[in-house]
Amino acid sequence: MGTVGKKKDRPAHGCSTIPKLALELKQIIHSTTHPKVPAVTPLRVMMPLGKLSKGASLDELIQMCIQAFDLDGNMGQNNELLQIMLTMHGFLIPSTELLIKLRTLYQDAMQNRSFSFCLRICYFIRYWITELWVMFKMDAKLTQTMEEFQELVRSHGEELHWRLIDTAQINSRDWSRKLTQRIQSNCSKKRKVSLLFDHLEPQELAEHLTYLEFKAFRRISFSDYQNYIVNGCVKDNPTMERSIALCNGISQWVQLMVLSRPTPQLRAEVLTKFIHVAQKLHQLQNFNTLMAVIGGLCHSSISRLKDTSSHVSHDVTKVLNEMTELLSSCRNYDNYRRAYNECTNFKIPILGVHLKDLIALHEAMPDFLEESKINVPKLHSLYNHINELIQLQNIAPPLEANMDLVHLLTLSLDLYYTEDEMYELSYAREPRNYRAPPVTPSKPPVVADWASGVSPKPDPKTISKHVQRMVDSVFKNYDLDQDGYISQEEFEKIAASFPFSFCVMDKDREGLISRQEITAYFMRASSICSKLGLGFLHNFQETTYLRPTFCDNCAGFLWGVIKQGYRCKDCGMNCHKQCKELVVFECKKRSKCSMGENNTLSDAGQLEVIPAGGKGLTNDCLGADEGPYSYPNGDGDIHTEVSKDRTIMLMGSSAQKISVRLQPAVKHRATQTENETQSLCLQVPSPPRSRTPDLTSHLPISPMPSPCPSPVPTRKKAYAKWENKDSIRKARAELRGGKAGIQELEKEKVFLKEENTALKIQLKDAHRRVETLRAELRKYVLDSDTHQKGS
C-alpha cells in the first residue's frame, strides 16, 4: 500500500477544529478566497452574502424568500438562500410556526388585496413541498397546519392558490427511499451462491458491507443532522441510531468471528481475512465501515491475543499498521481528512468525525449577532457541511449486491455485547500468562467516541423479519429438490458462519433439518445475541402432567393422558412439543429448587468446553449437571437485568462449541468476607449422573485464584453458596426477623393462590364430569323404562 496520505504540498491540520472554523467564518464574512483552507470537506463555491453577512431578522429572511419568486413562479438569484432557509430553519423556529407565519402573511395580503404577494407566498410553499416533501411526511403537526392553510385559501375562492399548495403530490412519492432502486441485486451469476464465511472472498464481503453501510447512510436526512447537532446525541433519532448500531455491530462481529475459532492458527486466518477486507473497503472509499473493521481488529480483546498474532505474517501486520495510521485521531484525523478530500465519485465518510465538526461549528459561532439578528453566516456554513453529506447519498456505489448474502449479514450483525463480555471471550481463548508482563487494556485508537455506548435493541418483530429473510435465502440456495429440508452438514457450515452457535436440534428426519427447525434455531440465537432477555436457554424435559396445564408459549391446552408436553426444570415453563423450539422468553431460574434437581454445581464464571460432534447431545444446551442459581440472602431482587449472568455460545470451524457463562459484575453482599472466586476455568463435562442427590454437591467449593482475572480492576465475581432450603429460611429468619417472615408469607401466599387456581380448575372439570355422568345416567334410565314398557 505504501505510505498513506502523505502530501507535501498540503499544510498540516491543527489539533483542534475551532481554528479551521474560524478561518472558514472569516472567508464567509469577507467574501474572499483563502487558498487551501483546512476545512472539513473540500472547498465549495460560497454564495456571496453581501449585507446578510451582518445578520438579518427572521421576518426579513422570510420576505427575501418570498420575493425570490416572480409572478410566473420562476426563481431569481436567491436560490441558495431558499435552500438554507427551508433546510436550516429548524435551528430558529419549528416548521409549524414557520408555516403559521406564512399563513398570517397570506391573510394580511388578502385583506390588503395584494394578490401578487399572495401568489408569491404560494409559490414559496410549493417550492417547500416539492423540494423538502419528507418534512410533511414525517411531521404530523406540519401536515395538519397545511390542511388548515388549504381550507383558508379555498374559503377565499382562490382555486389557483389552492392547487399550488396541494400536498396530494406527496403521497405519490416513494418516500421510503429504498436502496434497491439504485443498487440492483446480482442476478447475473448462475453459480450456486455460497453463504459460508470461509468461502467468501474479501472483495465480495467488502462490497456487501458497503451495501449495508450505504443503505443506512443515505437515509439520514437534513433534520436528522440538525437534531444531532442541537441535542448532541442520537436520542429520538432512529436513522442516526441505526447507522451507529450498524457500525458497532460490524466492529463486534469482527471481534466475535476471530474469537469463534478454537486455535490460534484459525484465528489468525480470520484476522488476515478481515485485514484484506479492510483493504477492499479502502479501495471502495468506504471509510465508515473501514473504521468499524479496523476498530474491531485493534480492540484490546483481539490485540491481547499474542499466540494469534504470532501466526499473522509480517506483510499483513504492516498493512494493518498502515490502516491504523490512516484512521488515527492524531492531529484531528489529519491523514483521514487528506485521503477523504482526494477521493472523488462514490465515498462514505466517517460519520462520527464530520458530526464532531458540525457540533464544534455550532458551538463556536453564536446563533445571533448584535440587535438580535440571526447569524446567517453560521447557517450558511452549517448548510454547506450538511449538504455535502446529503449529496453523497445521490452517488450509487460501484457494486452489485446479492440479496441472499445481504440477508445473512443483516442477521449476523445483530450483536450487542458489553466490553466485559468481549474480554470474557478473549480470556477464554487465551488465558493470561502470569510470566508475561500484564497487558494494559485500552480503547482502540481509531474508534470514534460518538458511537460508543449506543446499542439500540431490535424488537422481536425486526429479528423475526431478519431471520425469515435469511432462512428463505438459505433454502433457495441449498434446498435444490425443494422438499423443505437441508442436510445436517450444510446446516452446520451455515451455522459456523455466525459468531454464535447453540444447541444440537431435534431433527424430523435422520440427518435433515427442516425450515421450521432452522427458523427456531436462529430465532433463539438472535434473541440471545441481541440481548432481548433470553439470557438462558430453557432446560425442557418431557413431562406427564397430573392436572390441567396450558402452554406458556401459545396459551393452548396440553392434551393427552401421559407426556402431554415439556417443562423447563429451571424456571417451570410449560409448552407443547412443537412450541419448545419457538420460545423466545428468558429462562429465569428459580431460587427455590428441590434437592433432587441440584447436582454438582459450577463455579461462578466457569467455562465449559462441549464437543458438538457427539450424537448423544440433546436440546439441553447447558447440560444436566448445571443447577439453578440462587441468592442465599434473598437479594436477588437487587440484581437488575443488566447484571444477570448470561450464556454466550460460540462455534468455531472445527465444530467445537464453547459456552461462556458470564456472571454479575459486582460481588454479592453475602460473600464480602470470601476470597475472590475462580473467574474462568476449562472443564470437560462428565458423563450424566444419577438423579440421586449428592450431599457433597451442597458443600461450599474452596476458593481458587483466578487464572485470568478481568482487565477491569474493580470488577469482582459473585460467589454462589448453595444450601438446604430449610437452612436458608432459618438464616433469613435470624437475620431479618419479621421482614423475612413477611416475605416468606407473601411467597407462600402466592404459592397457595396458584394451588388454589389449579384446584378450582380441577373442581370445575370434576363438576363437568359429574354433570356428564348424570346426563348419561338419566338417558340410561329413560332408555331402560322405554325398553321395559315395550316388552
From Swiss-Prot:
Biased composition (Polar residues): 672-681
Binding site residues for Ca(2+) 2: D506, D508, E510, E517
Domain N-terminal Ras-GEF: 49-172
Membrane topology designation: Peripheral membrane protein
Composition-biased stretches (Pro residues): 702-712
Chain intervals for the UniProt region annotation (Disordered): 671-715
Region of interest: Ras exchanger motif region: 53-106
Binding-site residues for Ca(2+) 1, renumbered to this chain: D479, D481, D483, Y485, E490
Positions of the Ras-GEF domain: 201-432
InterPro entries found in the cross-reference section: C1-like_sf, DAG/PE-bd, EF-hand-dom_pair, EF_Hand_1_Ca_BS, EF_hand_dom, PE/DAG-bd, Ras-like_GEF, Ras-like_Gua-exchang_fac_N
Molecular functions per Gene Ontology: calcium ion binding; guanyl-nucleotide exchange factor activity; zinc ion binding
GO cellular component terms given for this protein: cytosol; endoplasmic reticulum membrane; Golgi membrane; plasma membrane
Coiled-coil segments: 728-783
SUPFAM superfamilies assigned to the protein according to its UniProt record, in alphabetical order: Cysteine-rich domain (SSF57889), EF-hand (SSF47473), Ras GEF (SSF48366)
ZnF endpoints (Phorbol-ester/DAG-type): 537-587
Domain free text: The phorbol-ester/DAG-type zinc finger is the principal mediator of the targeting to membranes and is required for functional activation through DAG-binding.
Function: Functions as a diacylglycerol (DAG)-regulated nucleotide exchange factor specifically activating Ras through the exchange of bound GDP for GTP.
Stated family: Belongs to the RASGRP family.
Name of the featured protein: RAS guanyl-releasing protein 1
Originating organism: Xenopus laevis (African clawed frog)
Lineage: Eukaryota, Metazoa, Chordata, Craniata, Vertebrata
